[in-house]
């Protein structure tokens, strides 16, 4: 069903659950390393493997960072919260239960204000932020798109099992209408910026450091009661969040219009076409048979400790943006463009690395954003760091690279050929400084274009572009355009 048709009949109600992997050195309940990227099943221990008799010990840093996230989300912090066992059987959960929090979360009743593409603010209310441990990772072999359906075998990697997670759960988002997909994207983006600013997570959606579950239901316009919801699991990019919700709105509306019913189920997002596919029936809280974990005491967070943590909060993203907008004298529209391109933090870091704001903006918003779009990845997942941009800007300023050569250097960085200096050396990109070679190229170009020489001497000085182009082609773009123009003017004087 067409998106506009959906909105004529139905009101979407949305809820977002975002799992944020904390960047602690060790796991939530054991001393095993929590680092990403190790060999499969190398960061494991008796606790994360669920071996008999192994007892959990709470990671104090994980609790501190959970409180920090709660405070930044304007939540109330519970003086006493508890861990609970969430019971279910799945190969990536060695204990057959997950240590989580149920009816006594560490943070609750907060909000996060997000800015939409046209500058409108929307307040997303937070129901809770609770601590839990991550599961292991399954790799399915022989199935479709890596899914379990049709798989001939499944491999289990328990490195991730026990890594600290904070799950941030929104209250139902009502009244969003056509803007529901945009609000979801803006919220996830704002939450990612927040945890990165706090220094508690790298917020990498592409690596699973943040994973989004999107709950959606439709109800006829004017109806108060919620419809049956579906939960699209483990969405791993901002674009995918927007597409998944858009597709689910259209799919559910079509089912309802055809006289069908919506099944309460999980669904899988398909990156290839932006659709969702059927998963499994969705459990209720009762199905998990939660009960307080008898191996873990309550988590006590005295007011004094909470206030000490509050005092350590860094400049938060929205405060930073207001300061930057004033310092750089940006209009509201210019600021929105940077935010909508997910480029602002990268630009700020590039300026901190030594460029001017205009130089940093020119690179991130144009050429590098274009490359990210062509690759279908988020800007910060392209492989270009602020230090790379600062380096090419410096080399252009020093006359060692032209803008064209600088773009080739960035291409090499994206291709994984090394840092900027390594790419310049390997590709031989540095500007030609052989005056004799450049002068010969200019002489050859002038000799090959007598009509342009004649027009120039007749007073049309704008025709030299073709000569400059011929020289740049002859030198494979390595001549300094300013030097070429000076030589042309000198020879035609």
Curated annotation (Swiss-Prot):
Keywords: ATP-binding, Ligase, Nucleotide-binding, Protein biosynthesis. One of its GO terms (molecular function) is glutaminyl-tRNA synthase (glutamine-hydrolyzing) activity. Residues 280-291 have a biased composition (Basic and acidic residues). InterPro entries: Asn/Gln-tRNA_amidoTrfase_suB/E, Asn/Gln-tRNA_Trfase_suB/E_cat, Asn/Gln_amidotransferase, Asn/Gln_tRNA_amidoTrase-B-like, GatB, GatB_Yqey_C_2, Gln-tRNA_amidoTrfase_suB_CS, Gln_synth/guanido_kin_cat_dom. Its EC number is 6.3.5.-. The keyword Ribosomal protein does not apply. SMART domains: GatB_Yqey. Residues 268-291 are annotated as: Disordered. Gene3D superfamilies: 1.10.10.410. GO terms for biological process: glutaminyl-tRNAGln biosynthesis via transamidation; translation. It catalyses: L-glutamyl-tRNA(Gln) + L-glutamine + ATP + H2O = L-glutaminyl-tRNA(Gln) + L-glutamate + ADP + phosphate + H(+); L-aspartyl-tRNA(Asn) + L-glutamine + ATP + H2O = L-asparaginyl-tRNA(Asn) + L-glutamate + ADP + phosphate + 2 H(+). Heterotrimer of A, B and C subunits. Allows the formation of correctly charged Asn-tRNA(Asn) or Gln-tRNA(Gln) through the transamidation of misacylated Asp-tRNA(Asn) or Glu-tRNA(Gln) in organisms which lack either or both of asparaginyl-tRNA or glutaminyl-tRNA synthetases. The reaction takes place in the presence of glutamine and ATP through an activated phospho-Asp-tRNA(Asn) or phospho-Glu-tRNA(Gln). NCBIfam families: gatB, PRK05477.1-2, PRK05477.1-3, PRK05477.1-4. Belongs to the GatB/GatE family. GatB subfamily. PANTHER family: GLUTAMYL-TRNA GLN AMIDOTRANSFERASE SUBUNIT B MITOCHONDRIAL AND PROKARYOTIC PET112-RELATED (PTHR11659), GLUTAMYL-TRNA(GLN) AMIDOTRANSFERASE SUBUNIT B, MITOCHONDRIAL (PTHR11659:SF0). This is Aspartyl/glutamyl-tRNA(Asn/Gln) amidotransferase subunit B.
